[in-house]
From Swiss-Prot:
UniProt KW keywords: ATP-binding, Ligase, Nucleotide-binding, Protein biosynthesis
This protein's name: Glutamyl-tRNA(Gln) amidotransferase subunit A
Biological role stated in the UniProt entry: Allows the formation of correctly charged Gln-tRNA(Gln) through the transamidation of misacylated Glu-tRNA(Gln) in organisms which lack glutaminyl-tRNA synthetase. The reaction takes place in the presence of glutamine and ATP through an activated gamma-phospho-Glu-tRNA(Gln).
Family designation: Belongs to the amidase family. GatA subfamily.
Organism: Geobacter sulfurreducens (strain ATCC 51573 / DSM 12127 / PCA)
PANTHER family: GLUTAMYL-TRNA(GLN) AMIDOTRANSFERASE SUBUNIT A, TRANSAMIDASE
Name of the gene encoding the protein in the UniProt record: gatA
Amino acid sequence: MELFELTLHELHDKLAKREVSSVEATRALLARIEATDSRVNAYITVTPDEALAAAEAADRRIAAGGLTPLTGVPVALKDIFVTRGIRTTCGSKILGNFIPPYDGTVVAKLREAGAVIVGKLNQDEFAMGSSGESSAFGATKNPWNLACIPGGSSSGSAAAIAARSATATLGTDTGGSIRQPASHCGCVGLRPTYGRVSRYGVIAYASSLDQVGPVTRDVTDCALMLGAVAGHDPLDSTSIDLPVPDYAAALTGQVKGLRLGLPKEYYLEGLDPDVKRALDAAIETYRGLGAEFVEVSLPHTDYAVATYYLIATAEASSNLARYDGVRFGHRAAGAANLIDMFRRSRAEGFGAEVKRRIMIGTYALSSGYYDAYYLKAQKVRTLIMQDFMKAFEQVDALLTPVAPTPAFKIGEKVDDPLQMYLSDIFTIPVNLAGTCAISVPAGMSAAGLPIGLQLIGRPFGEETILRAAHAFEQATEWHRHTAQL
């Protein structure tokens, strides 16, 4: 087995036994990036010099007895996390040359743990997208089929895992942006409860919906990554001050007696036959493991996509007002005056999808429409939250599809925003409710593309869904399938 093929926990074990050095593992991964990324385009920026220096420091730390689960492990970050001294673009021309002067909290935590950051990953521009096609740095390709999308917006985070060009990655999830690409690329992707992980130093899209989470090769790696980045942060006012459990200790493999809910609104006509087949098989696997199933209802599901696209775009309209060409980012040349410079900098710097969402959000917040659109959407969001809380009175977790179809062809939906937005129909409600969910590999389509299942937990119920995902993983072989590049 090549070093780049090792999972995080397998590499950790080899580092602990001194069977391999961090420098060796990092060199192997950098060579893998060099060999694959011209085809996959998972990375925007690769940092070999910084990575090798960090690997050398990690080897010294290991020799001194300072090993943590992440020490010496090469990881990569979605290009939405500010990284001191390393270009951070958020997939946009407007930040094409932005080099932050500080690290975001999760980046600082990874560095403190001794992780080796090898680069910044491609994404939909400002995390606005479901396919990885809206990046100013070119579309990311799905390693399972280079003609297909990897999902978005954390496209590079999932594609790098599938291509074995990162040992573990971090992404963000605003409406499904971790879980959907994880499903399409055959990875494990976790969106933690809102407030579980600090957002300080995450470039904002929709502040009440954004959350940081890991994309990994298996559930054990996911638990280790979450444990490294979770926790209260005084720099993030929405961060929750709760103890961080030992997530890896929750992976007992036992789900006997676990009550899993099947929301009837998620199992309707129109679900892709391959997805339905994978979900039916997963349900039978869980039955065999001793889990119990209960039909539940989330009656306001039909309103989730419309609600999300009003709230998220309204928040984006506000958050992206800061990009004006004055203090940082792209500045248009030859402007006649200050107002002209604002207009031209934004017109040149933002892509089409970002402009579309800014306009929708500005309209929803405008005088005369605020009550009819934004305020009503917030009321419906409360109803969606209540739906989940009622469901969790009956069950421990929910089992649903992640996406209505496997990965589609690049360019197939780019001219049909509504169809693109509906790609997240099963993931968006979780973000509106603020709770946690995980995508885990559960099957393959007839065309050889991965399919994931989604486990949704109650707020701060990450241990439960990790345990359930791990039990499924142990009972199946889907996570062992690898893309052939």
